[in-house]
Curated annotation (Swiss-Prot):
Keywords: Cell inner membrane, Cell membrane, Hydrolase, Membrane, Metal-binding, Metalloprotease, Protease, Repeat, Transmembrane, Transmembrane helix, Zinc
Protein name according to UniProt: Regulator of sigma E protease
PROSITE patterns, alphabetized: PDZ, ZINC_PROTEASE
SUPFAM superfamilies assigned: PDZ domain-like
Subcellular location: Cell inner membrane
Cofactor or coenzyme needed: Zn(2+)
Organism whose genome encodes this protein: Salmonella typhi
Further comment found in the protein's record: Regulated intramembrane proteolysis (RIP) occurs when an extracytoplasmic signal triggers a concerted proteolytic cascade to transmit information and elicit cellular responses. A membrane-spanning regulatory substrate protein is first cut extracytoplasmically (site-1 protease, S1P), then within the membrane itself (site-2 protease, S2P, this enzyme), while cytoplasmic proteases finish degrading the regulatory protein, liberating the effector protein.
Gene that encodes it: rseP
UniProt-listed InterPro entries: PDZ, PDZ_6, PDZ_sf, Pept_M50_Zn, Peptidase_M50
Gene Ontology CC terms: plasma membrane
PANTHER family given in the database record: MEMBRANE METALLOPROTEASE ARASP2, CHLOROPLASTIC-RELATED, REGULATOR OF SIGMA-E PROTEASE RSEP
Family of the protein in this entry: Belongs to the peptidase M50B family.
Length: 450
């Protein structure tokens, strides 16, 4: 319950910030173009708070935080007094109206740059993309990528950390040939490997894209050595102590901690014969895991904590820049995200990416909560990502979106007169239906992932 409330709070804050940024873009440019703004609303429905400024603009925070709008004076919506007609939106030039409409998405892109600027000034911790293990028969295994190598570049784009690797690889989903440059850790002797990503599919909210390719990043090592044994646990009753190294389980040699975890989890209430090493001496013990119910299924539980060897410092990176350099890096990062978003949307349309990859508000809320838990840097990065997506999607040429309005203005400029109201009304209905269908599909995908 607490996690749901946390996700919801993080989602509402994110939505409020991004909607305010988007609508402020429309508002600011409208004011600069001499258009009278009657209302600036964050949310829909009943007003929870309202205030009117000296220019007559009413500012509103409404009950339903799923959008917002800027209401401008417009003769097409209501009669306008003669002395105010020059302040009506419809009486401005095509260029001015286009600037007002485009200002919302542009504000989202500027916000993303600002968020990344803050991130790069604070410093982004990362891990060099060194491969720990390769899953047999995976896409990475078929490309003959070896453990212990470092992913230096994807299709010529340098990848200094795992986040850069993920960004570049996801943009290549559905491609037949993607070239990755690898080198032994600490070496610059690169080799090119080719990935076939035509059949690559993963669930973004459940799977790491790198892991779904069969690549396990080099991380902290977890040894089959106990660092802690909980009091009154199954392990304590079996006589296990901190410092014990587990050598065998039921006669099977043990070199990886996760193998021990699997043995314990799969054998609730069943005795397991352990061979351990304690201060240089070999001992035999019997461990009978306690039983716990996890999602309605009985699982074994021992009550131990393994010894973890931290990742060596040479594997760690931090991307941190001065104020000016951070602007350049933030702009480049935002541009990369914009290209990725357009690329992925294009592949959704062509079918190269399956529609079940489309995410809706539930997945976004989960992402908001998770990033907020990790800290301010990751929450800012999440806001930047969603802000870019919001800006790109709003530029889609659907009549109910900013892109649709820009399309009508382009037609007006070409033909020398506005598109007829009948055509606009029909287009708005079609656009609304398509948008509802798209939102319905995104929600369906969200619920199917729960």
């Amino acid at each position: 319950m607490l996690s749901i409330l946390w996700n919801l709070a993080a989602f509402i804050i994110a939505l409020g910030v991004l909607i305010t940024v988007h609508e402020f873009g429309h508002f600011w440019v409208a004011r600069r173009c001499g258009v009278r703004v009657e209302r600036f609303s964050i949310g829909f429905g009943k007003a929870l708070w309202r205030r009117t400024d000296r220019y007559g603009t009413e500012y509103v925070i409404a009950l339903i935080p799923l959008g917002g709008y800027v209401k401008m004076l417009d003769e097409r919506a209501e009669p306008v007094a003669p002395e105010l007609r020059r302040h009506a939106f419809n009486n401005k030039t095509v260029g001015q109206r286009a600037a007002i409409i485009a200002a919302g998405p542009v504000a989202n892109f500027i916000f993303a740059i600002f968020a990344y600027w803050l991130v790069f000034i604070i410093g982004v911790p990362g891990v060099r993309p060194v491969i720990g293990e390769i899953t047999p028969n995976s896409i990475a295994a078929q490309a003959q990528i070896a453990p212990g190598t470092e992913l230096k570049a994807v299709d010529g784009i340098e990848t200094p950390d795992w986040d850069a690797v993920r960004l570049q690889l996801v943009s290549k989903i559905g491609d037949q040939q993607t070239t990755v440059s690898v080198a032994p850790f600490g070496s610059d002797q690169r080799q090119d490997k080719t990935l076939d990503l035509r059949h690559w599919a993963f669930e973004p909210d459940k799977q790491d894209p790198v892991s779904s390719l069969g690549i396990r990043p080099r991380g902290p090592q977890i040894e089959p050595v106990l660092s802690e044994v909980q009091a009154n646990s199954a392990a304590s009753k079996a006589g296990l102590q901190a410092g014990d190294r587990i050598v065998k389980v039921d006669g099977q040699p043990l070199t990886q901690w996760m193998k021990f975890v699997t043995f314990v989890r799969d054998n609730p209430g069943k005795p397991l014969a352990l061979e351990i090493e304690r201060q240089g001496s070999a001992l035999s013990l019997t461990l009978t895991p306690d039983t716990k119910s996890v999602n309605g299924k009985a699982e074994g539980f021992a009550g131990v904590v393994p010894k973890i060897i931290p990742l060596p410092e040479e594997y760690k990176t931090i991307r941190q820049y001065g104020p000016f350099s951070a602007i350049l890096e933030a702009t480049d990062k935002t541009w990369q995200l914009m290209k990725l978003t357009v690329n992925m949307l294009g592949k959704l349309i062509t079918g190269d990416v399956k529609l079940n990859n489309l995410s809706g508000p539930i997945s976004i809320a989960q992402g908001a909560g998770m990033s907020a838990e990790f800290g301010v840097i990751y929450y800012l990065m999440f806001l930047a990502l969603i802000s870019v997506n919001l800006g790109i999607i709003n530029l889609f040429p659907l009549p109910v979106l900013d892109g649709g309005h820009l399309l009508f203005l382009a037609i007006e400029k070409l033909k020398g007169g506005p598109v007829s109201e009948r055509v606009q009304d029909f287009s708005y209905r079609i656009g609304s239906i398509l948008l509802v269908l798209l939102m319905g599909l995104a929600l369906f995908n969200d619920f199917s992932r729960l």
